[in-house]
């Protein structure tokens, strides 16, 4: 497996522009030195050395002969060699001089750029305050080498932030209907656009607008929109209006997702920053400290943090393909495939929203009441589930936001997961046979769904695994799934991929549509970082029943109440623990399981291991025992106790079924953990026909004396109750997912955030000391000192956790890690490099 290129190192802890100029100047200084060192002493330099103006004038005045020129060339060469030796002895002084020259040449900010300068100063101060956490290659900062399946590389030459147009509509008195500290109501003319950064609720009052593929008509419903800087910004466009205009109202929302910035640096500076020019215009009548959860942007230069912002525009060929596919209605069964970073997920999201667009209330046309089925076969970048899973979802409403804003559909009113399978890896190539069986089982579930929703179309999102064995799997799916269409997201081939797909589509009598890939070249988060953000969002998201939209909590994993379950004894709640991949010694199961992400899988049959004969059921327990165990599980607002699964699953079990499952369990010698392993060399996975993944869990601790596991999981109690009512057993599957380093560093980042908030309060209190009594001010100062000491002690304790090191110096490694957080990632779009290695792409 090839290692990806390291990020380009910063030469000095200055701004990105100054650092780039310093590198360029240093390269110019070292370039003639390297040339001189590599040349033989008897040959003249390949490029004539630069002469002084005096020498040039003298040469023009007097036409010297060849002997003089040769002597002068030799003298110039000797001077070049001596300068190279001097630079070789003092490389640090040369770099320092270059940085000093760059600092001197950097002009001070003009008066009109005060907001931008203040934002840059604020960013530098925040970077100085934050320590860099490292666990091997860095906690909280995902190392490049860790993302073996990634499709981006660090940008060697980071492009300068360009003034990119975003909104065509300019707000003024004529199109602003109303505005206050939370709401903005505006009119948009036909074919005009408006782009907002942040998260907000959108209400269409008049006219028809398009947003991320969906056409929204006037209705009383509010649509939640998430527009972070990590992805291209959604564009609100008026497609039809009353008197040529549409009217929308945008409201601030309190989803709590912004609180995740206190737990991870990946969530910092992804929402709206300081007030833009449009914000200042619409907030004239309110306090200057008022801030909405969204900002209107005319161009990318309006952003106070100078981020790489781009609008989410739809290609014309994409639009025509979406219109053509949507005309098939309930007969649509489309497979979307293509190379990595080609826009498969974006196109799938646009098509999904277009099919789920609500019909206008004034028309009597056919309305899609059966929803849309979404079969996600990409375990590395799933849309509605955390990583490592393939699933079938039934959706009833459009979604506006990246995957980390809807990492789960549990208890959601907009959709549900019909069935899910835990692959245990971010790439299907780890076990293609299991992957294909999981896809076929999900397709069978879709056919069963058609009995209740006959007009439900199907969208299949295939991963970027399109070469080698992945191409064979894709062509087999095209021939076997009974599709209506196949979409390939690349016009540049290669032919060795397009031709087999075309032959498979022709054999299945399915049209193949080829579309251009996405125009985006740079992203601000790598695929590994986006996976980390999605999993962290998954564990911190909740969906209260009394509200429509989800909420996020900033409670760290260490302070979250765990689910406690016995793994041995008469009240055993976990039937087995499986480790996918290569076989490990039972003595190492404790180390492999502790602190890992595991899949919580409901086993529907005792013969659920692939290759075994099917059995009638997992147990012979009565329905009454199962219901009793489920009622104990779902005790409201109290600890979920999975130990009562014993009552649900241990009844009059058939001897053959019990012995069949128990014979596969190996008890570890020291911890007595139920190690489930079947196979030779690698463990056979669970059969998709007899298993269903309920979600992910984090193994917080293993209490060996009491034989208990502490699990942190967002799986609703109702989902566990349903599994137990049906007599299913619970198996934990340890796969090859990314290590949850974000969970280890949450306490540290939370402690630093608390300290910063306290420092802000202290600074605010000091400004008010002149108007207060001296004795009261002294008491407040003592209290503030005590609080500061407690917060520092909290930071110290949070930084002393295992597998984490806090670096507080200003070393080169510190600066490189800080620069890594701000860098861009360049997408690799070459479909085929002429190599047989699939890991390169």
From Swiss-Prot:
Residue ranges, compositional bias (Basic residues): 812-831
Keyword Chloroplast (UniProt): no
Skewed-composition ranges (Low complexity): 16-28, 92-105
Record has Iron as a keyword: no
Cellular component terms per the entry's GO annotation: nucleolus; nucleus
Compositionally biased spans, kind Acidic residues: 115-133
Keywords: ATP-binding, Kinase, Nucleotide-binding, Nucleus, rRNA processing, Transferase
Residue ranges of coiled coil: none
EC number per UniProt: 2.7.1.-
GO biological process, one term: cleavage in ITS2 between 5.8S rRNA and LSU-rRNA of tricistronic rRNA transcript (SSU-rRNA, 5.8S rRNA, LSU-rRNA)
Region (Disordered): 1-133, 812-841
InterPro entries for this protein: Clp1/Grc3, CLP1_P, P-loop_NTPase
Gene3D superfamilies: P-loop containing nucleotide triphosphate hydrolases (3.40.50.300)
Subcellular locations according to the entry: Nucleus, Nucleolus
Domain of life (superkingdom): Eukaryota
Binding of ATP, residues: 338-345
GO MF term list: ATP binding; polynucleotide 5'-hydroxyl-kinase activity
PANTHER family linked to this entry: CLEAVAGE/POLYADENYLATION FACTOR IA SUBUNIT CLP1P (PTHR12755), POLYNUCLEOTIDE 5'-HYDROXYL-KINASE NOL9 (PTHR12755:SF3)
Reported function: Polynucleotide 5'-kinase involved in rRNA processing.
Similarity comment: family membership: Belongs to the Clp1 family. NOL9/GRC3 subfamily.
Full protein name: Polynucleotide 5'-hydroxyl-kinase grc3
Organism classification: Eukaryota, Fungi, Dikarya, Ascomycota, Pezizomycotina
